Swiss-Prot record:
Ubiquitin-like domain segment(s): 31-105
Gene: Ubqlnl
Organism listed in the record: Rattus norvegicus (Rat)
Region (Disordered): 1-25
Example of a GO MF term: polyubiquitin modification-dependent protein binding
Organism superkingdom: Eukaryota
Listed PANTHER family: UBIQUILIN (PTHR10677), UBIQUILIN-LIKE PROTEIN (PTHR10677:SF9)
Name of this protein: Ubiquilin-like protein
Lineage: Eukaryota, Metazoa, Chordata, Craniata, Vertebrata
Length: 612
C-alpha cells in the first residue's frame, strides 16, 4: 500500500506543503500531486507507480464518499482505474482535478454545465498563498502545472442554488462562450468518455444514433451548439419538418423566413415551396406535380394575385372557345415536365397530339398559349388542343425509368402531328387556288435538276420536303416577291428581247425561261390575297410557261397525255419555241420528245445543235 500524506492547503512560511521536509527533498519514486476540488485544494505525496484505483480508495476515505462517485481528470483526460499515474504522464507537481458525483444519481452534462459554469465559469485557486492559477488554461500542455478540466460540485447545494432562468437563451449563450466549455468541447477524447459515465446520455444516443456523430467531430459539435444559440432558426426548422413528421398535417400557412420582403412572396413562393416540400416527402404523384403551376407565372414575369390548388389545370369552359383565336393552344402542363401520356381532342382530326409551345402569355391557371398570326396569311384550320388526363392516371406514380421515354415519344408525336396538320392545311389551300402551286414550282427549275425532278415527280413528295416548301412559301411577302420577279422577266422579254441572250444563262441557272412573245395585260404588281386573287392573263400561245405546265401535269395525276401524239402533247411547247425564234418544226419536236417536254432543256439542246 503506497504511503499517502494529506495536508491542508495552508502553507508554512517556507512555502512547502506540510509533511514535506523543509529542504524540499523528496525520496526517489515519490511524487507530489495537487488534488483540486471546487472548494478545496490538497497536496498528496504518493508513489509514482500508484494505480488510479488505489489513489481513488485513498481519496474516497479522505472525502468520505464512495469510490464510484470519484472522477479523476488530468490534462483533459479521464483517468481509468487500470491506469497508473506514470502511464498518464503525471509527475511531480502535476494537478489532478477531482469530480464527486451526486449520490442522487448521475446528472446530465447540460445540467452540470448550468450549475457550474453559469455561476462560476472559471474557478480559481482559493488559497491566496499557494500557487493559484485559473483552471481555464490550455489542455494537454505538460509544461504547465495546472490543467483544464470540467469542475462539478460534490453536491449542487453546497456551491450554488439552481437559477430558475439558467435555461434562457442568454444564459445558454454565455455558457457556450465560456473558454472552459469551448476547450472542453474541442477535446474529443473527453467527449467520448462522457456517455459511459452518464446513463441519460446513453439513452439519448440509443434513441437517436445520429447524435453519436456529434461526438466524433468537434467542428460539427460546435456548429450544432452555435445553431442551438439561435432559437429562431430552430423554430423555423421545426416548422419546415412538421409536415414531414405528420403527413396528415395541414400545410403551414405561415411564410418562410425572408419571404415577407418579396412582393406577394407570402402568397406565391410560400405556398409553392410548401407544396413542393410535401410532394417530395410524401411521394411524387402526377396529380401533385401538376397541381400548382406558379412557376409558369414566374417565367412569364407575372405575379399571381391569388394561388389556389385546383384540380388538374382544368380547360376553359366551352363558351370561351369563341373568344380564343384559331391558333391558340391550351395545354395542361407547363413545359411538358414529367407528364404521363394524355389524350387530346382535336376539332378537325381524331389524332392524338401533344403540343409543347413556348409560353407567350399566362393568365391564371388556364395556361393559354396564344400564338400570334400575321394578318396577311389566310387562317388555317383551327387546331385547338385540350389535354385531359386519363382517369387512371390521376393516382398513379411516375416510374423513374419511364419519364424520359414518355417525353421522347411525346416530342416525336408532337413533331409528326404538327407537321401533318400544317401540311394538310396548306394542301387544302393550294387545291383551292391551283395557280399558287404552279408559281411555287418555279423555284425548282434549274436545268441540272431536271433529271432529279423527273425522278421525284414519279413518286409523291416526302412529307418533310413538302412541309418545308409550303412553310417557306406561306409567307405572303415571299410569294409576292416571286410573282414580281416573274412578272418583271416577262416584261423584259416583251419590251427588250435584245437583252435575253445576255441574261439567258442566268435565267437557265435560276430556272426562269420566259417566252418573248408572252404579254401580260396586267402590269401592276400583285398583292397576295387568297380571297381575291385572279389568275393572270396570258395568250393561248403561251399558257404560263412550258415548265409550269410540265410540272403541273405529273402533280395532277392526269395520265391521258401519255396516250396522245407528240404533236398534240407538246403543242403548247412547240408554240412557245416558235415564238422564241426556233422555226424548225421537226427539230423542235425532236428536242421536246428527247427532253420529255422540258422547254428549257429543249432550248438548250437546240442551241447546242446550232453551235451556240
Amino acid at each position: 500500500m503506497p504511503h499517502i500524506i494529506s495536508r491542508s492547503p495552508r502553507m508554512p512560511q517556507s512555502r512547502h506543503p506540510a509533511g514535506v521536509p523543509a529542504d524540499g527533498n523528496i525520496p526517489p519514486g515519490v511524487i507530489r500531486v495537487i488534488v483540486k476540488t471546487p472548494g478545496n485544494q490538497n497536496v498528496f505525496t504518493v508513489a509514482e507507480d500508484t494505480s488510479v484505483r488505489q489513489f481513488k480508495e485513498q481519496l474516497s476515505s479522505h472525502f468520505k464518499c464512495q469510490m464510484e462517485q470519484l472522477v479523476l481528470v488530468s490534462m483533459g483526460r479521464l483517468l481509468k482505474d487500470h491506469d497508473t499515474l506514470s502511464q498518464r504522464g503525471i509527475t511531480d507537481g502535476h494537478t489532478i482535478h477531482v469530480v464527486i458525483k451526486s449520490k442522487h444519481g448521475s446528472r446530465s452534462l447540460t445540467h452540470s454545465f448550468r450549475n457550474l459554469l453559469t455561476n462560476n465559469p472559471c474557478h480559481q485557486d482559493r488559497n491566496p498563498k499557494g500557487n493559484s492559477s485559473t483552471v481555464c488554461q490550455s489542455a494537454g500542455m505538460s509544461e504547465t502545472k495546472v490543467e483544464s478540466s470540467i469542475l462539478m460540485e460534490p453536491d449542487a447545494s453546497k456551491v450554488c442554488t439552481q437559477d430558475p432562468e439558467v435555461g434562457s437563451p442568454e444564459q445558454i449563450e454565455q455558457m457556450l462562450e465560456t473558454l472552459c466549455v469551448q476547450r472542453l468541447l474541442s477535446n474529443m477524447f473527453f467527449m467520448h468518455q462522457l456517455p459511459p459515465e452518464h446513463p441519460d446520455m446513453q439513452d439519448l444516443i440509443q434513441q437517436n444514433p445520429e447524435v453519436s456523430h456529434l461526438l466524433d467531430n468537434s467542428e460539427i459539435l460546435c456548429q450544432t451548439l452555435e445553431l442551438a444559440r439561435h432559437l429562431a432558426i430552430i423554430q423555423e426548422i421545426m416548422q419546415i419538418q412538421q409536415p414531414a413528421q405528420n403527413p396528415e398535417h395541414t400545410l403551414n400557412p405561415q411564410p418562410y423566413l425572408g419571404l415577407e420582403t418579396i412582393p406577394n412572396g407570402n402568397i406565391v413562393l410560400g405556398q409553392g415551396y410548401d407544396n413542393f416540400n410535401d410532394h417530395m416527402l410524401n411521394g411524387v404523384h402526377v396529380h401533385d406535380l401538376l397541381e400548382d403551376d406558379s412557376f409558369t407565372a414566374l417565367l412569364a414575369e407575372q405575379v399571381l394575385e391569388q394561388v389556389q390548388t385546383p384540380s388538374l389545370c382544368q380547360p376553359p369552359p366551352q363558351e370561351q372557345w369563341g373568344q380564343l383565336s384559331s391558333s391558340q393552344v391550351i395545354f395542361a402542363n407547363s413545359c411538358g415536365f414529367l407528364t404521363t401520356p394524355t389524350e387530346a381532342n382535336l376539332n378537325t382530326t381524331n389524332n392524338a397530339s401533344r403540343e409543347n409551345p413556348a409560353i407567350a402569355a399566362t393568365q391564371g391557371q388556364s395556361n393559354v398559349c396564344a400564338v400570334q398570326q400575321p394578318t396577311e396569311i389566310p387562317s388555317l384550320c383551327t387546331i385547338p388542343v385540350i389535354q385531359e388526363p386519363r382517369e387512371g392516371d390521376k393516382d398513379t406514380t411516375i416510374p423513374q425509368g419511364s419519364s424520359a421515354q414518355w417525353l421522347e415519344e411525346d416530342l416525336q408525336q408532337s413533331e409528326e402531328q404538327s407537321s401533318s396538320q400544317i401540311t394538310r392545311s396548306m394542301i387544302q389551300l393550294l387545291r383551292t387556288h391551283p395557280h399558287m402551286a404552279a408559281e411555287m414550282l418555279l423555284l425548282l427549275n434549274p436545268p441540272q435538276l431536271n433529271e432529279q425532278w423527273r425522278q421525284q415527280t414519279a413518286t409523291p413528295l416526302q412529307s418533310s420536303q413538302l412541309s418545308d416548301l409550303l412553310l417557306a412559301l406561306a409567307n405572303p411577302k415571299t410569294s409576292q416577291a416571286l410573282l414580281q420577279i416573274e412578272h418583271g422577266l416577262q416584261l423584259l422579254a416583251t419590251e427588250a428581247p435584245a437583252l435575253l441572250p445576255y441574261i439567258e444563262p442566268y435565267l437557265w441557272g435560276l430556272g426562269w425561261l420566259i417566252p418573248s412573245s408572252c404579254d401580260y395585260l396586267d402590269t401592276v404588281p400583285w398583292t397576295w390575297n387568297v380571297q381575291d386573287t385572279v389568275e393572270p392573263q396570258c395568250p393561248e400561245s403561251c399558257h404560263k410557261s412550258g415548265t409550269v405546265l410540265q410540272r403541273e401535269q405529273p402533280l395532277s395525276g392526269d395520265s391521258s397525255h401519255s396516250l396522245q401524239a407528240p404533236e398534240v402533247r407538246f403543242s403548247k411547247e412547240m408554240e412557245c419555241l416558235q415564238a422564241m425564234g426556233f422555226v424548225n418544226y421537226n427539230a423542235n419536236l425532236q428536242a421536246l420528245i428527247a427532253t420529255d417536254g422540258d422547254t428549257n432543256a429543249a432550248i438548250h439542246k437546240l442551241k447546242a445543235s446550232q453551235g451556240f
